């Protein structure tokens, strides 16, 4: 009873804190609050509090249930939210390199944890006895590696999708460009002396516009490079986790079902996902290929991860159906 109450408290604390953090992030986009009262640093500390809250939640559920909390969809979602918190912690303590990971990790963590605690999963939040197939030491190794891999790959893929949005976003003419265009049209109505005077002002405006455009394009280029830098490294880490998870799952399957690979729906989609991200990493090894191409592949991988993660749970078929929506 005590553990159940503690779990309930930690769930609400972590969700409340991360909700406040996300609100602060949105406010800093609208108003420059970080220079006024240092809200941005406070939001980072909020994610740290959330990390420890989710960690306490997982440990409490572990002690309460008597097994590692990865036996159903609810527990795996909480663990996935914890994985996003870990990624944010890495960016928080790596302050030498400014990055925008928090813009991805915070909304992702609150969305996943919000879905897990929304009541849509029926009785899954209640701890239950493990089915015989899950009563193995391989549970911790296999499922934790897969979820960590999903978290890292999702985060890296979202960064790649942000790269595509920034790259293909059409930037409209600036106020200076519009102003210059109007002034050039007005010069046709005046004499030569006035024309010379106005064009001298236009030259100053044009120089200001060039400097502004150069500065804007420079920071845009820097942001694209930073997104590509972090997406590659996070996806590489996620690919390692996914590989270890698939291999450990194959060994576990051989011990349980007598075969390393059964082409179960989840196994098939995991293999497809692994192949897509292997293609991504192969593309990144070629420096002559633009980062846009690899970002497109990562975006495809983002969709495949959700199919692999939720597909079997929605259908409730195959050897991995014990964590589905239909099983209670």
Swiss-Prot record:
Record keywords, A-Z: Chloroplast, Cytochrome c-type biogenesis, Membrane, Plastid, Thylakoid, Transmembrane, Transmembrane helix
Keyword Chaperone: no
Any GO BP annotation: cytochrome complex assembly
InterPro entries: Cyt_c_assembly, Cyt_c_biogenesis_CcsA, Cyt_c_biogenesis_CcsA/CcmC
Transmembrane segments: 13-33, 46-66, 73-93, 101-121, 146-166, 234-254, 263-283, 295-315
One MF term in the entry's GO annotations: heme binding
Membrane topology per record: Multi-pass membrane protein
Pfam families the UniProt entry points to: Cytochrom_C_asm
Subcellular location: Plastid, Chloroplast thylakoid membrane
GO terms for cellular component: chloroplast thylakoid membrane; plasma membrane
Family membership: Belongs to the CcmF/CycK/Ccl1/NrfE/CcsA family.
The protein's role, per its UniProt record: Required during biogenesis of c-type cytochromes (cytochrome c6 and cytochrome f) at the step of heme attachment.
Subunit organization: May interact with Ccs1.
Stored PANTHER family: CYTOCHROME B_B6 PROTEIN-RELATED, HEME EXPORTER PROTEIN C
Protein name, per record: Cytochrome c biogenesis protein CcsA
Organism expressing this protein natively: Nasturtium officinale
């Amino acid at each position: 009873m005590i553990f159940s109450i503690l779990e309930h408290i930690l769930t609400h604390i972590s969700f409340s804190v991360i909700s406040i953090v996300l609100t602060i992030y949105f406010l800093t986009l609208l108003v420059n609050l970080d220079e006024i009262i240092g809200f941005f640093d406070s939001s980072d500390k909020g994610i740290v509090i959330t990390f420890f809250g989710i960690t306490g939640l997982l440990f409490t559920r572990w002690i309460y249930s008597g097994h590692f909390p990865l036996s159903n969809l609810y527990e795996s979602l909480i663990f996935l939210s914890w994985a996003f918190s870990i990624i944010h912690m890495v960016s928080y303590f790596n302050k030498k390199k400014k990055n925008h990971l928090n813009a991805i990790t915070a909304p992702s963590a609150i969305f996943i944890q919000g879905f897990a605690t929304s009541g849509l999963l029926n009785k899954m939040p209640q701890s239950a006895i493990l089915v015989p197939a899950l009563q193995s030491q391989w549970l911790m190794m296999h499922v934790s590696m897969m979820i960590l891999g999903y978290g890292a790959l999702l985060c890296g893929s979202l960064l790649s999708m942000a790269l595509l949005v920034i790259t293909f976003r059409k930037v409209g003419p600036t106020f200076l460009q519009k102003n210059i265009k109007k002034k050039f049209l007005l010069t046709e109505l005046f004499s030569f002396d006035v024309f010379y005077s106005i064009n001298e002002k236009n030259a100053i405006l044009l120089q200001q516009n060039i400097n502004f455009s150069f500065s804007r394009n420079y920071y845009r280029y820097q942001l694209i490079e930073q997104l590509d830098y972090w997406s590659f490294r996070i996806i590489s880490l996620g690919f390692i986790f996914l590989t270890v998870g698939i291999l450990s799952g194959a060994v576990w399957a051989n011990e349980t079902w007598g075969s390393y690979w059964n082409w179960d729906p989840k196994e098939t989609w995991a293999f497809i996902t692994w192949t897509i991200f292997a293609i991504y990493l192969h593309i990144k090894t070629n420096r002559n290929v633009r980062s846009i191409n690899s970002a497109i592949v990562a975006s495809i991988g983002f969709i495949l991860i959700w199919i692999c993660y939720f597909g079997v749970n929605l259908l409730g078929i195959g050897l991995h159906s014990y964590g589905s929506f239909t099983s209670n």
